[in-house]
UniProtKB/Swiss-Prot annotation:
InterPro entries: L-lactate/malate_DH, Lactate/malate_DH_C, Lactate/malate_DH_N, Lactate_DH/Glyco_Ohase_4_C, Malate_DH_type2, NAD(P)-bd_dom_sf. It comes from the Bacteria. It catalyses: (S)-malate + NAD(+) = oxaloacetate + NADH + H(+). Keywords: NAD, Oxidoreductase, Tricarboxylic acid cycle. NAD(+) binds at residues 12-18, 106, 113, 130-132. This is Malate dehydrogenase 2.
Length: 329
């Protein structure tokens, strides 16, 4: 067993996604069965009691890998020397809330957390933004954590990737691990573009096996994009366990590598595929050695261009709102 514990910060620690996430991290699903961990939990002061309840449950599991649990209401304390951070907490959109107001509240949260990460976290920290609007929240975080490496912050789009892979596997009647080279482009929102034009089962292209363009455009894409809404309607609450699972999948591949597989991550654009540089955007990557490399030179047809541009416009509009918010202060 490795003797030095890794420090893992989790914000929104009293929430349902964190509740599904923390126990899996503590039992080794993220870093493996020989890596001790210290959990550094962050939430609002009014959630302190609920977080203590989670702490008691974690203690009662007697996880051998869990060496310490720290609870903080101050981001600087929660992120101190963190090796990995899952930023799950964010301000959810409530009934009647204007988009500008939602972005304003999250801008304040992620400005504070960005500064705290910049000052306190390990210089090799990997930060995954889960709380929505995840792409724009991650962009705000980068803005206020300028001393961290350019590739230190990612936003989660793996949940959409996993949903797409699962739906394709069901359609083709194969195991999910048979599906390779699936891509989800763009924002974690209904404008996302789940793209199976290059996905394979063995050497065969999924699009040739399905051979149904109408299903692709009119059923598959909207079903992936609206899956979260369907879950809320079915269970009366948003995705929690599947979101936590996707967060672990994305971070684990980022840390240990994706074995040559394409996976989808929202990362700062380098200008490829006509996506504005710096925009936090879902793209295909291959992870290796603790880093990710963008998959280049994928063919973009007219339909794909239209779908990608839709997400680009949405994220640029959100960025414009945020820029005006900060200019006003």
């Amino acid at each position: 067993m490795n003797t030095e514990a890794k420090r893992i910060a989790v914000s929104g620690a009293a929430g349902q996604i964190a509740y599904s996430l923390l126990f899996r991290i503590a039992q080794g699903d993220l870093l493996g069965e020989d890596q001790p961990v210290i959990l550094q939990l962050l939430d609002l002061p009014q959630a302190y009691g609920a977080v203590q309840g989670v702490v008691m449950e974690l203690q009662d599991c007697a996880f051998p890998l869990l060496k310490e649990i720290q609870v903080a209401t101050d981001p600087h304390a929660a992120f101190l020397n963190a090796d990995y951070a899952f930023l799950v907490g964010s301000k959810p959109r409530t009934k009647g809330m204007e988009r500008r107001d939602l972005l304003a509240e999250n801008a304040a949260i992620f400005r504070t957390q960005g500064r705290a990460l910049n000052e306190a976290a390990s210089r090799d920290v990997k930060v995954l933004v889960v709380g929505n609007p995840a792409n724009t929240n991650a962009s705000i975080l980068r803005r206020f954590a300028p001393d961290l490496p350019d590739d230190a912050i990612s936003a989660m789009i793996r949940l959409d990737h996993n949903r797409a892979v699962s739906m394709l596997a069901q359609r083709c009647n194969v195991d999910v691990d048979s599906i390779a080279d699936m891509v989800v482009w763009g924002n974690h929102s209904p404008t996302m573009f789940p793209d199976y034009r290059h996905a394979r089962i063995g050497r065969r292209l999924v699009k040739d096996l399905i051979n149904d363009e109408n299903w692709y455009r009119e059923s598959f894409i909207p079903k992936v994009a609206q899956r979260g809404t369907a879950i809320i309607e079915a269970r009366g609450a948003s995705s929690a366990a599947s979101a936590a699972n996707a967060a672990i999948d994305q971070m684990r591949d980022w840390i240990f590598g994706s074995d040559g597989r394409w996976v989808s991550m929202s990362v700062p654009s380098d200008g490829s595929y006509g996506i504005a540089p710096g925009l936090m955007f879902g793209v295909p990557v291959i992870c290796d050695g603790g880093r990710y490399e963008r998959v280049k030179d994928i063919g973009i047809d007219a339909f794909a261009r239209q779908r990608i541009d839709l997400s680009v416009r949405e994220l640029q509009e959100e960025a414009d709102v945020v820029n005006r918010l900060f200019a006003d202060r």
